[in-house]
Structure formats: structure tokens, C-alpha cells
Amino acid sequence: MTLLGTALRPAATRVMLLGSGELGKEVAIECQRLGVEVIAVDRYADAPAMHVAHRSHVINMLDGDALRRVVELEKPHYIVPEIEAIATDMLIQLEEEGLNVVPCARATKLTMNREGIRRLAAEELQLPTSTYRFADSESLFREAVAAIGYPCIVKPVMSSSGKGQTFIRSAEQLAQAWEYAQQGGRAGAGRVIVEGVVKFDFEITLLTVSAVDGVHFCAPVGHRQEDGDYCESWQPQQMSPLALERAQEIARKVVLALGGYGLFGVELFVCGDEVIFSEVSPRPHDTGMVTLISQDLSEFALHVRAFLGLPVGGIRQYGPAASAVILPQLTSQNVTFDNVQNAVGADLQIRLFGKPEIDGSRRLGVALATAESVVDAIERAKHAAGQVKVQG
């Protein structure tokens, strides 16, 4: 039996978000729908989820002592990480002391860096992956590239949204790629993964929910990336029944091995009927923002339902749908959005995240569309995103 209290009352059910970006904002909204008290934490003030939380705190989430202090102050029933850059050893301690880390502290620690999850997938679960080597110095990095061969990809073991990632075609790129990887790591300079390039037809995110009533799958989400950042996503991605079966089998093994209740974003390469594991996030995925318009329960609603111990039942997908990011480039601490009236309409929506500032290129919103086909939905979403004029 799940007992939920009322926010701001003595018996409130309290959820603490560690990371308060646009994904955390949607999780906070879903918590609010159930009367759950929300505490938003991030490294900067006025982050998107803080706008819709009951309270907020600004801390360095890589500082275990600071993390413990805010947890002891707020006494949350659920700690919900939204990002990788968190003091995961402290999360493990807090979980051992009885706190509920979503989906569990082990999953957060393993997926905090690419090494933990790659070794779990390839070496423990024996799942198909790309070839890979790890390196923690430039000389070992060069040896790893020589072993893997060209082309290959280098990534910091801990980063997100493509930061520090380079597609390497020749030896002339090595020095610059190493330096960029050292700058792009979420916890500073350090270890990298060098991966062989996988030949694939397309990539998918298989949003997978581990809940009290079993494992559930959303329809596969296709996506297009530039420099490691997602530009558009769509649902459903067409694939063969055998490939879908294999994708679900891989995703099921991964989420059950990680443990805990919640939604996981399982990234996979698909080539014909073959499926290769890429990465997993133990939380809602940015490409899954399409589910805000494509499903009866968005990935955020599913995450909240699962970690609160509620059954999922089933997931209804409405048909072809797409998302396209609003990704301006400017510098401002007073951003405005013009021409919004031309970005919305029948079966056409936008979300503006409310980020307090921009310095360069930053994702500030997303357009969402449905249509008779996925191709048309993508075009509608891209057109809508292009209509929004960002100024500052």
C-alpha cells in the first residue's frame, strides 16, 4: 500500500530533486499533481525545477558534506537525481542509513560514469557493445586509439549532452581531442573512454519502466544528434519485430541489473535485426520529451509513478509524434521569446524551460507535434521551433 501525504503539512511526502533542469522541472510538476512536496537542488539559482518547487537550495552536488547537510535539513522521503554530477558515495551512505535514492544508489553510481555501466553491460551481462578501451593519461589514450583504430569516438567517462566528445578520423586530431575531453568532464579532468564506431541504421532510446507491477516499455524513440546533443526525437521509431524484441530483452536485463523502481533511458544502436547496447540513464531522458505529447503518461509521469511504488498498468501511445529543440546562441540574463503565436496550434505545443541566462548555445525550450506520419511530425516540430525568436 502506498501512502501519500499532503504537501506543506506534517505528514507530507517529500521528494528532493538533485539537479533542477528542464527534465527535473517536469518531474516536479508530476509530483505536484499528486500533492507531493518538492525540494529542488542545483548548483545555480533559479534553475527550471526551482520555479515549480516548494523550496530550493543551491549547493555543489559533488560535495558530499554539502549534500548531507541539505538532506538532513529537508529530510526527504525520496532523493531523485536528475544529473550524473553528484557525490554518489554519499548517496550510497544515505541509502544505507535508510533513505530512498531513486532508482537506487548503486544505479546512480554505476551510471555516473561510462566505465561503470559499460563494464556492467559488456563484462557482467555479456551484452553486445562497441569495442572500447579506457585511458587516464594522454599516452594511454593514444595507445587506446591505436588499438581501436580509426574512426573512433572519445568521451570523458563522466559528462553529459555531448560535452568533451570528439569523433576522431585521424592522428592529427588526437592532441585536441584529449584536451577537449579533459575540459568536458563533469567532475573535471580525468579518465576517458575510446569507442569503436558502430555501423548502425539508427539509434533509439527505449524508455523502460521498472515498477511494482513489473517492467514496462514505451514505444521506441528515434532521435537525431549534433555534437552529442539531441536535436529532434520522434516516436514510434519503426523497426523490425525481432529488433524490437531484442531491444526490450537488453533493456530488461540492464534495468533489472541496476535495480530499483523508476524510468530508465536505454540507448541502443539498431542495424537491421541486430541491437547493440550504448548507454543508460537511470532517469528520464532528454530525447523522451516527445512523450509530453505522444503518450497518455509522459516519461516524467511514469518515473514518478514508479518510484512512489504505484503500478504503471499500461502505456498508451497516441501515434506519430516528434520534438525539436529550441537552441539559440546568444548572451543574456533577460531572455525573451517572440513570435510564440506561430509556434503553437492544433496538435502543436511548446515548452519554454525558464532558464535564467544563456551564454553561447543553450537549450531553452522544445516544440512538440503530432501528425499523420513521423516525417510530418518532425517537420512540424522543427518548423515550430524555428518560429520562436529568442532575444536578450
From Swiss-Prot:
Gene3D superfamilies: 3.40.50.20, ATP-grasp fold, A domain, ATP-grasp fold, B domain. GO terms for cellular component: cytosol. Keywords: ATP-binding, Ligase, Magnesium, Metal-binding, Nucleotide-binding, Purine biosynthesis. The lineage of its organism: Bacteria, Pseudomonadati, Pseudomonadota, Gammaproteobacteria, Enterobacterales. Belongs to the PurK/PurT family. Pfam families: ATP-grasp, PurT_C, RS_preATP-grasp-like. N(1)-(5-phospho-beta-D-ribosyl)glycinamide binds at E22, L23, E82, D286, K355, R362, R363. Mg(2+) binds at E267, E279. ATP binds at R114, K155, S160, S161, G162, K163, G164, Q165, E195, G196, V197, V198, E203. Involved in the de novo purine biosynthesis. Catalyzes the transfer of formate to 5-phospho-ribosyl-glycinamide (GAR), producing 5-phospho-ribosyl-N-formylglycinamide (FGAR). Formate is provided by PurU via hydrolysis of 10-formyl-tetrahydrofolate. The keyword Membrane does not apply. This is Formate-dependent phosphoribosylglycinamide formyltransferase. GO terms for molecular function: ATP binding; magnesium ion binding; phosphoribosylglycinamide formyltransferase 2 activity; phosphoribosylglycinamide formyltransferase activity. One of its GO terms (biological process) is 'de novo' IMP biosynthetic process. Pathway: Purine metabolism; IMP biosynthesis via de novo pathway; N(2)-formyl-N(1)-(5-phospho-D-ribosyl)glycinamide from N(1)-(5-phospho-D-ribosyl)glycinamide (formate route): step 1/1. The gene is purT. It is an enzyme of class 6 (ligase). It comes from Escherichia coli O157:H7. Residues 119-308 form the ATP-grasp domain.
